[in-house]
Each structure stands twice: as C-alpha cells, then as structure tokens.
Amino acid sequence: MTAKLEFIIGRAGTGKTHTCLASMTKALEYEPLGRQRILLVPEHMTYAAERMLAESLTHSAGFLQAYVFGFRRLARQVLIETGGAHLPRISDIGRRILLKDILLKHEKELSVFVRSIGKRGFTDTLGRTIAELKRYRLTTDVLRAAADDTHIQGRLSQKLKELALIMDDLSARMEGRLTDQTDRMERLAAQLKDAPFLRGAEIWVDGFDFFNPQEMAIFLELFHTADTVHISLTMDGHREGSRVRVNLPENTRDTGLFARSYQTMQALTNLLVEIDPTAVPEIHLIEEQHRAQKSSLAAIERQLFGHARLAPIQDNALRLVETATPRLEAEAVASDILRLARAEGYRYREIAVLVRDMDTYAELLLPAFADCDIPCHLDAKRPSTHHPLAELLRAAAQTAWRGWGYDTVFRALRTGFFPVVAEPAADDYFSCGDWQEAVDWLENYCIAFGIRTERQWTATDAWNFVRRTIPEDTRETEQNAVRIAVEIALDAMRRRIAAPLSILTQHLRSDESTAHERTRALYDFLDQLSVMPTLEAWRAAADAEGRLADAAAHRQIWASCMTLFEQLVEVSGDDVISARDFAELLEDGLDALEIALIPPGLDHVTIASFDQNSLAGIRVAYIVGVNAGTMPRAG
C-alpha cells in the first residue's frame, strides 16, 4: 500500500494550520470511530495544537480516534505498542555526565579534545554535536572514512577520529541500558510499520519547513503504512487552471525565501516516487491572507525581501523605535504595553515579545515588566545555575576538595541553608535574628582574625581571639560583655556550620570512594541541613507573595538535583572514581540544570524566542534587539 500525499501550501498567514484542523475535524465528524487521525507538529507546538483541536471539536466529535504528536511522543507511542519503550531515556544532565566520564577515561588517548575537557560547557557542545551527527545518520564508520581521506589532514582528521572514539564508547555504555531521542527515532523508523494504530491512518503534518534524514526515514515508512498524509509547507504557488505551479523563483532559487520548503517538497515527492513511480502528490494552494489585515503588514509580508518600490502606507500597524541601550528598550516595551492595556483595551494574552538574543533581553524584560505590574511568562527554560541549592552543592563540594578557603565557605553560607541562627530558646546573641546579618558578623570576625583553614574551622578549642585582647578586669563592662557574647555566639555558629561540612569533606576527599558513595554523601549533607523543608518554606512564601517564577524554581530544583544524583550513580555508580573526576562530573551536571517556568495565569504577556515559539492569536508583537549581526544572525 502506498499512501496518498497532499501538500497544503501557502505564504505565512494564509491559514494552513486552520485548514489542517478543519480537515481533521471534518474527518472525525464523518467517521468518529474509524481509522486513526493524527496531527504531527513540532514538539513545542503540541500543547497549542491539542488546545486548538479540542476547541474545534467542542460541539462535534471527540478525541477518541485523534492524536496530537510531536516526533518524540510518536516514537514513545510506537515503542509502547511494538516494544522498546522499557529502556529509560537519558536526560540532558545524564548525557553530559556520561560524556564527561568518557572524556576522563580516554584522556590519554585524546590530543585535540584533551584541551577542552575541563572547559565549562564543552560536554554540552559535544553532546549536541553527537546528536546532530546521529540525526543525519552519520555513523562512526563514516567519520573514520572521512578522517582517512587524503584531502583531510592534520587537526580535522584527528578530531574526527576522536569524535568517532567517543561516539563508539557512548553507544557501548548506553547499549541495553539507556536510550536517547536520536536512538528512539531510529527505532521508530524501524518499527513504525508494526504499530497497529498507524495502519491505514490519516496524518496531517503542520509547522515544519524541513526534515532531517532520520525524519525522512520515518516518512518513508509512513508512506508504506498510512492511508493519507497531508503536509503543510510555507511557500508560494501560482494557480494555472486546475494545476498549481510551484517552480517559482522564490521557491527554486537557493537564496529564495521559500527555498527550504520547496526542497523539502521535492525530497518528500522523491520518497513517494521511490515506492510507487506512478504516484503524483496533490497540491492544495491557499492564497487569501488572513493574518496581515493591515495594508502595511501585508505589503511587508509580500515584499520584505523583494525590490519593488512601495508607496507610503499610513495605517500605524508598524512602528520602528530606536533606543540607546537594551535596558531602555525593555522599559519602552513595558511602558507601551501598559498604554495598550489601559487606553486601548488590549488583553495581556494578546501581546507577545519576540526575542532573538534571549540571554541578554530576558534579564532586562522580566524586571521591567515586574516594575509595571505586567504579568508575563518566559516561554523558555531558565538555567538554574545560580539557584541557592545549586550554589550550595557547588560551593560545599569545592570547600571539601580545595580546602576551607574564605571564598568557598562563605559562598556556601550565603545560600541560606546552614543553621546559622540558633533556636529561639537558646541563650545566644543571634537567636531569632536575621541570618544574613549573622553571616556578616561571622565574615567580619574571620577576616579580622585570619580564619582561612579547615583546622581553624574545626578546632575543638573555642574561638577566643576577642577575649585574648580584653584584660580580665575589664570583661564585666557593658561594651566588653557584648563583644564576648558575640564571640561565644559566633563560636557556636561555626560549630553548627563545621559539623556537616566536615563529614562531607571526609567522604569526598577519600581516594577509594565510588561514585555511589560520594553521591550518597552529598544527599546526606542536604538531608542534615534540612534542605527540602527549607525549599518548601521558600516556595510557600514565594506563592503567597505572588512570585510565581521563584516558587516554580524552588519547587523544581529539588527534583532536578535528585535526577542529577540518580544520573551520577547510573553512569559511574560502583566504579571507584577520584575526587577530581567526580568534582568535574558534578560541575557539569550542575551546569545542565534547568527550570521550566509555568504561566502565571491565562492573561499574561508571553516572552518567546523569535526562532521557536507556539504563539497563536496574538494581536500585538514587539520584536526587540533588531540589530546588525543579530537579525539576521551573523554566520
């Protein structure tokens, strides 16, 4: 059986997604208990697509025979039905830890990558490179053959050989134990034909303009298995009677606006012809522009990359604003959003801010919106590198491995997890006081008396540096009595601090410990400091004060750290590992921690990536940071 193939084409804003949903809804209404109807969209669009489909089905058919999938969810469903879903999927954290472990094991065999092993973020770059090679089905044999090519010499040749070595070890370590998304995609292509729910299914594919070789292999199998496949592509066409001509300059030129979509159409057509040389795909062209209702926006959509001379259009649909700094730009956006909401009746959910350079602008837009009381949602995962718990683990581990230096000890103390302040019932100068003020007192004391070593922090004798400077006959004066009371309280404080740190140091410094034992020591350290109850208290306080992003961070960070610990044990559990190597594994894992933020409600401004977002129903869009080198992006 060969599937019927239909391309739904049209320029941006012509309603291709609406056409897919309407066609799917009509099919479900006509045959509610028939074959499966599947909508395949990019991963970041699955939620929005499910919601739109549910809204279109509200007064008609149900979801019984309908699925909304990204490739990841499709792979999971097929593997559940055909076998292979039992293997745990390695997380990004786990992959980075595993790659770091492989690099450390092969350190003596590497000559090019050895210089980068200790560099921050290298395992992330390496992991993404390997994933990209697997998506393009470039095996280690291909890499080695390329390395031996006479046209490739020196450093590049050696780099390819080392990359092949790392990929082989990664595959061997994961074989039968772990899987990742690229491996699941290979299994999806191999097992798709055995999935009962895909036999004779009708499939709509929307939101893509390109498919990598792994995805093309999946389409090859879908053309064998499904009954009908509808694929929407953003490109232009020209109607000539009953035919649609697509070989237009904007499509066929390598620099054409729709060249990528046209090449995808040709590649998919060639796949279909491989199966059935007589097959001819249908083309459904949508020409009417629905999104750009204003004349100026419609003209820009048509001529942004053209050379036609445009007559001036005064409809205020497009404004160009220049500011001196990104901070002023963020404040101007916040101010204008307030104007729209107050004076023109816009809802916040109808407004979006599109950002190309998220690292720069997220940290400026969020406080600017907070100052104006504008509810907003950052539609991107936020690194949790600087969350107090991540900082505690990093600083405490460095204290254990590098010695109890002033910087590392006080970095750990300022996270807020240590029992700095005594219990209210204790006869202590700092009981019931501000813990940050107490840490300031302790820091000043350590600076004044040069306390910088583990031996000084863990000394059994009391700290009495102040008392040594006070003559016996003046210790009863009010001023000196306070100084002595402060010193006694600081001594009790350092003992409460030193006890858990000292135990952690003993476990982490041992040369004969396994990764499991070192990870257990970190967990016991967090348990001794009551980190989980503290995070819960912080979360409740943040919720009560309306700081929903902070509440989400406190809620997720514990689970993220437990995942990190599990991956550390999974990768190197019973192997003896040096303190240095474990420190590097932990550091890489902490760098990979991320927090997914939850929208604060139904009515909020969305801050989203310019490259990848799932925005729909937006009436106003602010595009910030439109600078040379950023848009279009240099390189």
Q: Which sequence ranges carry the predicted segments?
A:
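Polyanion-engaging groove/track-forming segments
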Residues: 1-635
